Amino acid sequence: MKMTEAQEFLTPTKGVNSSKFNINHGHFITNLENQESPSKLGAYTPGKYSTSRVIESLHKQIDELTSTNLKMTSQCHQLVNELESSGKKQNKQLETISRLQTENMNLNAILDRKTNRMNELESSLKKQTVFNEDAAKKNLELEETVKKLSLENEKLTEQSTLYKIQYEAIVDAHQSYKQFFTNETSTLRNDLMSLKQSMTKQLESKTKEVLAIDEKIQNKLESLDSAQESFKKHASEQIEDNIKELRLDSWQSSLREAQALLKEYKSQAQAEGITIQEQPKASIPQLRNPKRKTSGQKRTSFYGTPTGFSIPSNKQTPPSSSSTQLPGLKRASSIRISSDPNRNR
């Protein structure tokens, strides 16, 4: 069924959310609770109230409720209109906010660019200031230099006038000496040509001698380099042969076996009640590698051997036969303690 316009007007919740009436709904309920109703007045007694009064009171309450409903409905429409207008305002404000945000972002980007440009300009300004200060200092120095040069120029001008007078006197004397020196110059020119030819011949002969000496020196250096390489090779081969003759690996294995036998002998002696006093072991001497000479130490002379090497000798010192003991071991002296005489019986 379709509602009439009056019913739609009297219906406050038509097309409106119930949350919109929360503001005035509390006041309406409070007014209803404060009004007296027949149920609040206690049980009805025919002696106190009549039916007409009850009906009148009910009509009054209905009229009051109707007027209150009309007021609430009008307030509801007003609130709806205000809500719609506030929604439109909010949409406009949101659009304005978004537009202002985009403008703010653009302005921030522009501000960042301007800030960067300002920093660049400040740095360039500092550099230019330093450059200007340096230029000002140089300008002051140049001004002082100009002053000094102007003073020197004045002195030189005075000297030039004096020199001019002297020059005129010298020119006069030169004319008289010119003829004499012309003759002398011709004779000296002839002597110079002959001297030049003789010096050229001597220079050519000396150059040939120097080239021959240089060639001899180069040959000597090459022979010294080859002798140095052969000495290095011979020394390395001799060192390897000496290491092979020493047979360090077999000596180390023999040393380990001797140490094992010594430990076994000590354990047996301690089991028999014999104490052994050990002397400190001698350390095995380390093999020394031949010292390497740097290129700065291998200085050679034109007619001698390299200063960093000596002539190798083929003589080898044989190992001493008197020391038959292995290196690192010494005979430990044992002292017998008096044991039980009945033990060996």
Swiss-Prot record:
It is a peripheral membrane protein. GO terms for molecular function: RNA binding. Keywords: Coiled coil, Endoplasmic reticulum, Membrane, mRNA transport, RNA-binding, Transport. Residues 92-272 form a coiled coil. Residues 297-315, 335-345 have a biased composition (Polar residues). GO terms for biological process: endoplasmic reticulum inheritance; mRNA transport. Residues 273-345 are annotated as: Disordered. RNA-binding protein that binds specific mRNAs including the ASH1 mRNA, coding for a repressor of the HO endonuclease. Part of the mRNA localization machinery that restricts accumulation of certain proteins to the bud and in the daughter cell. Required for the delivery of cortical endoplasmic reticulum into the emerging bud. This is SWI5-dependent HO expression protein 3. The gene is SHE3.
